[in-house]
UniProtKB/Swiss-Prot annotation:
Note accompanying the cofactor annotation: Binds 1 Fe(2+) ion per subunit.
Binding residues for substrate: W77, Y84, R85, Y86, D139, R165
Role played: Dioxygenase that repairs alkylated DNA and RNA containing 3-methylcytosine or 1-methyladenine by oxidative demethylation. Has highest activity towards 3-methylcytosine. Has lower activity towards alkylated DNA containing ethenoadenine, and no detectable activity towards 1-methylguanine or 3-methylthymine. Accepts double-stranded and single-stranded substrates. Requires molecular oxygen, alpha-ketoglutarate and iron. Provides extensive resistance to alkylating agents such as MMS and DMS (SN2 agents), but not to MMNG and MNU (SN1 agents).
Binding residues for Fe cation: H135, D137, H191
Lineage of the organism: Bacteria, Pseudomonadati, Pseudomonadota, Alphaproteobacteria, Caulobacterales
Keyword Disulfide bond: no
Keyword Manganese listed: no
Record-given protein name: Alpha-ketoglutarate-dependent dioxygenase AlkB homolog
Keywords in alphabetical order: Dioxygenase, DNA damage, DNA repair, Iron, Metal-binding, Oxidoreductase
InterPro entries cross-referenced by the UniProt entry: Alkb, AlkB-like, AlkB-like_sf, Oxoglu/Fe-dep_dioxygenase_dom
Gene name in the database record: alkB
Length: 220
């Protein structure tokens, strides 16, 4: 995982200094992670999934999600008839979540919050046909902490709006190696993934997109 740290140190600082601000509080660093760093992260995620398998959770209304999910870190997000929440063990295996790779902690220190580490990394696996409807990330205890998102694999058509569901939205493509951040006025903005572009990357075995989102779920 040192390759990710080198990517940040050697070629990330210039990009970090000049993000693309899509809307106030939503910044994108296109191509921040080089291909070696991307491969290292995919390898770490898939190794973690052997301990905490991907699952297609159901919404609180009983509908299965098209996106398969797991997590890294001390907490993972889950959904069922009881609602949406963070838990300290995989809901199916009962085992603790795998550790978060140090490289992700390094990225958070630079782009997230240098004083308070993340306690959860949600791992979303999008295969062909999967999507994520517009939603807010509001299950965390303190929204002052950002959400840091890393795209790996196939390009996603990402959509972001405002803090109200009916606010106008705009879409952009997030490619493998792109990193983005929701912070401040955009922290509770509605956002989602309309679709992925199958075959736009060969990074993820079997095709698809892996999205990593670093969060601070509980109060510091």
């Amino acid at each position: 995982m040192a390759v990710v740290r080198r990517a940040v140190a050697a070629r990330g600082l210039q990009m970090i200094a000049k993000p693309l601000t899509v809307v106030p509080g939503f910044d994108v660093w296109p191509g921040l992670l080089d291909i070696s760093a991307q491969r290292a992260l995919v390898e770490a995620v898939l190794a973690g999934a052997e301990q905490a398998p991907f699952s297609n959770y159901r919404t609180a209304y009983g509908k299965p999600m098209s996106v398969a999910m797991t997590a890294l870190g001390s907490l993972g997000w889950t959904s069922d008839a009881r609602g949406y929440r963070y838990v300290d063990r995989h809901p199916e295996t009962g085992r603790p979540w795998p550790d978060m790779p140090p490289a992700l902690l390094d990225l958070w220190t630079v782009l997230g919050d240098p004083e308070t580490p993340p306690d959860s990394c949600l791992v979303n696996l999008y295969r062909d046909g999967a999507r994520m409807g517009l939603h807010q990330d509001r299950d965390e205890a303190d929204p002052r902490f950002p959400v840091l998102s890393i795209s790996l694999g196939d390009t996603a058509v990402f959509r972001i709006g405002g803090v109200n569901r009916k606010d106008p939205t705009r879409s952009l493509r997030l490619a493998s190696g792109d990193v983005c951040r929701l912070l401040g006025p955009a922290r509770l903005a509605f956002h989602g993934v309309d679709r992925i572009l199958p075959g736009s990357s060969s990074l993820v075995p079997g095709g698809g997109r892996i999205n990593l989102t670093l969060r601070r779920a509980r109060t510091a």
